[in-house]
Amino acid sequence: MRRYFRLILCFCALLIATAVAGQTIKWQELYKVKKKDTIYGIAKKFNITIDELIRANPAMQKADYALQKGDQLLIPYPATKPATATTPATKTANASAQCSTTHKRAADGTVRIGVMLPLHNVDGDGQRMVEYYRGVLMACDSLRSQGIATHVYAWNVPIDANVQQTINDDNARQCDIIFGPLYTKQVKPIGDFCRKNGIRLVIPFSINGNDVAQNERSYQVFQTPAQQNEASINAFVQRFKGRHIVIVDCNDTTSRKGVFTFNLRKRLEKVGTTYSITNLKSTDASFAKAFSTTLPNVVVLNTGRSPELNATLAKLNTLTATNKGLGISLYGYTEWLMYTKVYTDYYYKYDTYIPTTFYYNPFAGKTIAVERNYRQWFKSDMRQALPRFALTGFDHAQFFIRGLHKYGDRFNGTQQQNTYTPLQTPLKFKRVGTGGMQNESFMLVHYKPNRTLESISY
């Protein structure tokens, strides 16, 4: 197992060289070496040549390589045999729909996955997407142990890729689902291809435009800032009825949170909730006047930056030291999840709620196990990013593969069809008009004063 996943990194590197030719990664088996196995015997067992086996497993090319019991080997398809049979697409009765009804799942139930992302080490985009891809592969391995078979095809699709060449690959038409692309200009051609061939397209990261509304086969995971603000305001108003709201002007000229606080104020006025506005530079006495002594207070800053949060916490410490029993909760921003090493104690102290579409919990047992396996297989830690890209790929693959395995073409990713508890990145889709599916998953991460933590999903 460990050796196999180390090999994946080598394959990602090989993709750089093969991208122009549109070559894909494809394999038929992950094989665990047994005590009496030989290289010749393994090759013969799977009807491949020794050279094909060695080429698929770069570690075997080292002069000091020795086959050992427990090694995991990538078994490629024979060079003369296609990975899967090609089913030619035919026109549908409704030509205007342009969505093929001839795409069929593999007879044995195997879920065929395509990954069309920049899988290279040239820049940060490629490095992040390689990590996402690793997460997809780890999910496939995990699902295999549960009896869910997968075939994975991967294409290196950098920013300047010839997308037409990629989708012309016969293997692309065999996919049940494709994850990608990363870049906006690649969405329409790949989306049109998926629509024509009845393939689901999962767009995992931020793009511009509204392609999801035009393509019923697309799944847009990323939520725009406007969508997230709307969800956050809805959750705020629902949860904090009967509270007094205190909005703190932090004098941050670089902040983009003014859109949130402006719309929050409009909503509060609409529902008749009282609020006060104070300033971070005000005196302690003036700052205290903004708070209610009879109602619980909810404090909202108009910036997500750490320095202003730190200054606000200092103000709150002074306030609560001289006003015992004052009820205070903090309502923050997703960025605050990056500051947990510094402010966790304060989050608990001030009953903090953080709105987000993901939550990375480094103390969760399943998360620890996946990170440990990642470290063993790839000899490196996951990138220190929020969200973790490998966990994102793991969650996305688990969600969609499980759904396709259980529901087949009836799967659309709604909350009612969810069969997976995520490590970090929950998904919940809703159709956009007559178009595709938009992720609407949203949660509040709540740091409770009793030093426990809960996630509240909406």
Where are these regions (language model features)?
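N-terminal signal peptide c-region/cleavage motif recognized by signal peptidases
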Residues: I16-A19
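Extracytosolic ligand-binding ectodomains
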Residues: R2-I8, T24-K32, K36-N47, D51-E52, ...
